[in-house]
Amino acid sequence: MKKPIRVIFSDLDGTLFYGGPAKCTMTKENENAIQRWTAAGNRFIIATGRPSSIRDELMERHQIECDILACNGAKVILDNQVLWSKEVGPEQIREIMNLCEPYGDKVDFALDMDWTEWVVLRRHGFVEENYGGAIFNTTVEQYISVPREMYPNKIFMVCADMEIKMRLMSELSEHFEGRLEVTSSGQDNIELGCPGVGKDIAVKEILNLLNLDESQAAAIGDEVNDLSMLQCIPFGFVMSSAREEIKQQVPREIGSVHQLIDWCLEYNNN
């Protein structure tokens, strides 16, 4: 007997934010659809590479109810409770700095964590250039020079071009094999997180905690770091706007989050 879909996992950048009226905002169609979905007693879970603090911003700005799978699964908040938070330690951060050193100003990275300011490798680098609205008062060197209560759930790295990205990504994967997960959420970036962390792993653990089958979840995304999530359940959808090499790896395709929600509601009603 068919079971209804009860939870939707949605990527943010390039997915939920696709077509929004301003940077980091969603369309009114997506907002209304999420409200309809949760009003029907279902869950909407943000599945993103971003820190978990984005959840509160979305709930306030768009009047939606949601949980979050943050930093590619390194931190999960469900029903306002932190289920887990896995951090990259200072020793590993130092190793990353050393591997980036030969690239000079062609590579920059930030520590992804719920903090009021961004911690960056270099001032006035690529991260600051691309995210000028954020606050940049502390460098990575300054941050790891003294013991801290909080370390990042993920490292977000920006490269000058695709060639550098692919070369460095290969070096990082080889150096940290078994110690850090290396992935990407865009053509110019690299993301590093704790081993055994991934959107797919977090999705399966959340479904287990909610006593839901894999067939009772749907997911949507558009990038490399979404692929494991889209491929681990029957109803994984890739955004029509995604790059061809991403779309080729996911059998189901759809145009937007609100279209997926409509699809799920129709599926449940038939």
Regions found by a protein language model. Name each.
Residues 106-220, 228, 232, 241:
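Conserved acidic, metal-coordinating active-site core of Asp-based
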